[in-house]
Structure formats: C-alpha cells, structure tokens
C-alpha cells in the first residue's frame, strides 16, 4: 500500500537530491542495523518523506557519513541519520507488521504468513518505544478491516481511517506543530488509500476481493469524478 509519495527529481537541485538520497540510505542502514536485514524490504518513499519533513520542522542534530551500499558495494554514498530516523524506522516496522497481520485475516497467503512471523520478532523494539502509537495503529486497522468486511463503499469514510493512521504517524511530539503535522499525515494517508484502491480495482474484481470502487469497475469516467469530489483535508484530530 505504500510507495506513492515520491519526489519529482527534475524539480530538485543536485544538492537537494543528494540529501534526499542520503536520508533514504540512512533509513535503510538504520533498519538493517536495528531491525535486521529483512526489515529493509519494507523500505519506502513515504517514510523517507516523513524523515525529511520532520527533520525540517525540528532540525535535530544529524550525523552524516560515507558508506558502501549493498546495491553498489564499490562506491560510497552519503548517509544521514538522526533521532527522526529512529522514529520513522519504528513507525515503518509498526505499519508493516500490523498491515501484514491485517492481510492474514483476509488472504492468508504464504508470503504474508512468512513475512508476518519474521516481523513479529522485530516488533518488540518499536512497540516498547511507542506503545500508544502501536495500539492506535492496530485499533484503526481493525476498524478498517471491519468496514472492508462489511463491504462499505463510502470511500471517504474508509479512506479516512487510513488517514487517521498516517496522521498519528506524522505527529512526532505533542507540541505546537501537532495539528498541522496530523493534517498533513491525514491527507497523505487518504491519498495513499485512494490510489491503492484505484490501482488494484481490476485485480480485486477478478479475484473477488473487496474494493471500495468496485461498483465503478466499468465506469472509469464516473470514478475519476467521484475521486475528485472526495474531501481531502477533513482530519479527525486525536488530541
């Protein structure tokens, strides 16, 4: 479901792009060192954006190093990490684990089962550091699963649940930035859910799986209009 929040490389300077890659590599390295090699398979651009955004807001002290990469072991790359990297990595683990747990309620695919039990061993560290966020993510995914089981096709209502999850993830601290960061995360969460549902529509229809857009399977123009009218920006702020 993740991976939709990407940069437009053409709009960045060379220096900006190098820094973006350095934060991405920092997340990758941190996941490997603290949660194991397997955790890097869950690496995504959405969480990298979270690091860049929160770093810009809070300006924590960062460590910049030059390290080799498994993709290119003969050339060192810039790697940037800070306290936000640790937080984002923990959120990445929590989101991946609970999403896999949610998937097992529906499909019970072998690859999901395997990944779930592997990530179960990685969950402890992230849960111990952020138990309230972990419980909130789990509770919201349970609510989402309930709506999906009921075949709820109110896309605004359904996507708002995932918006709530990402809104909570984007709140790093309880301070004056909380409301704005929650709203940004909420909007991004709805955006991710909508795009994922839209892209999966044909496959979900063929396999008889739930999709909130299922009634528009042969109505592409109507579906586009419906998506345009969905209210992005109405967060249910958790204070």
Question: Where are the regions a protein language model picked out?
Answer:
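Acidic catalytic motifs of isoprenoid enzymes
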Residues: 1-183, 190, 194-228
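Residue-level detector of conserved catalytic or cofactor/ligand-binding positions
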Residues: 231-239
